[in-house]
Amino acid sequence: MMSYAEKPEDITRDEWMEKLNNVHIQRADMNRLIMNYLVTEGFKEAAEKFRMESGIEPSVDLDSLDERIKIREMVLKGQIQEAIALINSLHPELLDTNRYLYFHLQQQHLIELIRLRETEAALEFAQTQLAEQGEESRECLTEMERTLALLAFDNPEESPFGDLLNMMQRQKVWSEVNQAVLDYENRESTPKLAKLLKLLLWAQNELDQKKVKYPKMTDLSKGTIEDPK
């Protein structure tokens, strides 16, 4: 028997993969994780198709996703004012109680004005709608200044702040809106699959902190596992 003072033997990648292959996961459990992800992220059409293929019933009425889907489409198209109006119609108090979310939506509208090269409208909007929040929050002020800095460049997409004009920026705002709406409705706002991935990263970090050598998953999207280092 190994004492606590002894160092455990290093495990190779092949040995690790063999152990993983011996772990059995029920297909139904995997399907429930997939359905949970689709519902939480608002992918109604995919959830309906997956229900037919897997026989797994969603935890909510899929028709309840319709309003969130409309909001997502608006945000991802850059129609921020329309999205704000729909959010206010759906949950009138949400943006009043979540001022940081409201700021991010307003900031995104400013970004869309800059994208369209509507400089005067962008400056006026920043002064009338965002300046007060910038005075109240240093973090908001920093983000507003970073956004307005786009105006200093002939090609803002190629500037040091060009990431604000990427599609990922709209996606980031939508994710924040989606989580806020689900939280407001007292519904699960983070997919169980995301929680499991976070648990995996936490466990690997704990092993790293203890200087344990083990086959590490280095790419979550591909499931890439590298040899111990």
From Swiss-Prot:
This is Glucose-induced degradation protein 8-B homolog. It comes from Danio rerio (Zebrafish). Signal peptide: none annotated. GO terms for cellular component: cytoplasm; nucleus. It is found in: Cytoplasm; Nucleus. The gene is gid8b. Core component of the CTLH E3 ubiquitin-protein ligase complex that selectively accepts ubiquitin from UBE2H and mediates ubiquitination and subsequent proteasomal degradation of target proteins. Acts as a positive regulator of Wnt signaling pathway by promoting beta-catenin (CTNNB1) nuclear accumulation. Required for normal Wnt signaling and normal dorsoventral patterning during embryogenesis. Pfam families: CTLH, LisH. Residues 26-58 form the LisH domain. Identified in the CTLH complex that contains at least MAEA, RMND5A (or alternatively its paralog RMND5B), GID8, WDR26, and RANBP9 and/or RANBP10. Interacts with CTNNB1. It comes from the Eukaryota. The keyword Translocase does not apply. One of its GO terms (biological process) is proteasome-mediated ubiquitin-dependent protein catabolic process. InterPro entries: CRA_dom, CTLH/CRA, CTLH_C, LisH, Ubq-SigPath_Reg. Residues 64-121 form the CTLH domain. Disruption phenotype: Morpholino knockdown produces morphants which exhibit loss or reduction of dorsal embryonic structures and Wnt signaling deficiency. Keywords: Cytoplasm, Developmental protein, Nucleus, Wnt signaling pathway.
